[in-house]
């Protein structure tokens, strides 16, 4: 768990809680990883290198209300928000989320492209 917190601090990932969640996701594209201290082996390591989005993590063990509100059934789960609204969700399969940094970045880039075309 300490490794998760240290990597988050070093790479600009905001630790999200009930107190700051709404404020942190209300503007722009925000990518949030929901994780649990009992499953740190499968946190999404490529998550911290994403560009053009704000990054946040929610420890569901400490923020059960956010887990319930966002209907998190398995960790890790990654939710992409834009201006406070969910637009994409990726959920783990048997506690492991199989994705690449390129796939994650493409979701962000595609959304930015759609916004530019408006």
Predicted regions: what they are:
Residues 15-51:
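Local sequence-structure signature of Cys/Sec-based thiol-disulfide redox active-site neighborhoods
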Residues 13-17, 58-60:
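Short gly/ser/thr-rich secondary-structure transition/capping motifs
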Residues 37-40, 61-63, 86-87:
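Solvent-exposed loop/turn segments at secondary-structure junctions
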Residues 4-12:
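Hydrophobic h-region of N-terminal signal peptides that target proteins for export
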Residues 69-82:
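Structural micro-motif
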Residues 80-118:
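Non-catalytic, surface beta->alpha helical segment in thiol-disulfide oxidoreductase systems
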Residues 45-71:
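Mature extracytoplasmic domains of secretory-pathway proteins
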Residues 34-36, 58-61, 93:
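Active-site-proximal beta-strand/loop segments in catalytic clefts of secreted hydrolases
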């Amino acid at each position: 768990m300490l490794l998760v917190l240290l990597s988050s601090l070093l790479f600009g990932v905001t630790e999200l809680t009930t107190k700051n969640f709404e404020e942190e996701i209300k503007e722009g594209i925000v990518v949030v990883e929901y994780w649990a201290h009992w499953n740190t082996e499968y946190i999404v390591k490529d998550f911290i290198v994403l560009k053009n989005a704000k990054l946040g993590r929610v420890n569901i063990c400490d923020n059960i209300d956010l887990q319930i509100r966002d209907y998190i059934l398995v960790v890790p789960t990654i939710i992409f928000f834009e201006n406070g609204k969910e637009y994409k969700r990726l959920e783990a399969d048997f506690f492991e989320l199989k994705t690449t940094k390129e796939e994650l970045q493409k979701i962000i880039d595609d959304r930015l492209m759609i916004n530019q075309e408006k």
